[in-house]
Each structure stands twice: as C-alpha cells, then as structure tokens.
Amino acid sequence: MSEPSRGRWLLPAVAGGTFGAMLTALVLLVAAPQWLGPRMVREGLLADPQVLADAADALRDRQTAPLLASHRAALETPFASSWKGAEKPDVVLVEFFDYACGYCKASLPHVEQLLREDKGLRVVYREFPILGPDSVAAARVSLAASKAGRFKQYHDALYQAGRPGPQTIAAAARAANLPAAVSDSADIEAELKRNFQIASQLGASGTPTFVVGNRVLHGAVGYAELKKAIADARRKS
C-alpha cells in the first residue's frame, strides 16, 4: 500500500480536522444574515477566497484550544534530552515522529532550517513508532540515548544511516557514542505509552504530526506552513 502524499496514516482518525472545519466554515458563511444575500456572499468569496481559509482556521483553533490546553504541559515537556533549539523558548513546536517514516525524514530539513532561523523556537520530539517492530526498536534506543543526553546525536545519526533496522540502529548508537544503555526500562515504556495516549486524544493518526500553539498539523506540511503556524502561535501567546 503506497504512502499518501503528505504523511503516513495508519491509526483510526477522529472526526473533524481541516476538511471538517472548512466545511463548517463554508456553512456558516453561506448561512450569513439574509441581508447579505447569496450573491454578495459568493462575490465576496470570489474576491477574497482567503476569507474561507481564515474562517476555517479560526473555527479549528476554537475547537482544538481546550483539548490542547489540557495536554500543554505533557506535550511541551520533553523526555530527558529529546529536544532541540532554545533553552528558554517563547514558542514550542512538538513533533510526533517515526524513524521509519519517509515523510518525517523529508520534514527534517524544514525543521532544521526553522531552528537555525528562529532563536526563540524549541522543537520537542515525541517518539511515535507506528510502522513496525524496527520503528519500536529505534524509538526505544532513541529514548535511552535521550536519558544519556545523546538524543541529538543519535537522532541525526540514524536518519543519516537510513531506514531503521538492527544494523542501522547499532551504527547510529555507535556514532552517537552511546553507553551500554538499557532500552526497555520502565520509564521508556511509560513514555511510549504516554505518547500514544496523547496522540490518540489529539487525533494524530500518522506521522509526522506537529503541534504548535492551538494548531495540530497532520503530515509533511512543509517549511512555509510550519513557519506560519509558529508565527501564529507566537502572536497569540
């Protein structure tokens, strides 16, 4: 089964999302006060279609804000050293990722560019291994590396080594100079379980999934969309 164009979707998705928000926004616009009339609504949308996108964004933010607020601390507090960027950030981008996900790898240069450009940004990485046993093995070693203060080194080394498997995971661990860390400890298993629970509650059905401010972005949305979401989160904070 081929991967979709922006991300890998394997878990049941919850109702709603961007399409649902846009549909609701369209209904609200079409059901505008009668004095506008359908012709004026249509002409307004044709003249400035961004109005519909803005309405969808506003509606989506109102719907997700309470849910994200209840998980904010858990989302933005990294496990050990599983983060990059600002020591004292003014905005946090959370990425649910899987080392075996090609779209996560494709998003890597966009995230790295944002980190280089934005000195107030922190990226928190949440292990979300949904693509099989090798993904789970890679995530466990990644969390062990995080506990040893070597997350960045292992993270970058494994992406450079290729798709996770016994050989590439071992090579990345060596490249990161990892000690003989235990990768199946209780705190590692608890972290994986917690990530899956939060992802499910947020409707994160695949990787990558990004969370920033009151936005949940599904798939490899690209540099421009991530930058816009970060700017929006900073403006509304």
Regions found by a protein language model. Give the residues of each.
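Cysteine-centric redox/oxidoreductase cores and disulfide-bonded domains
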Residues: 129-207, 211-237
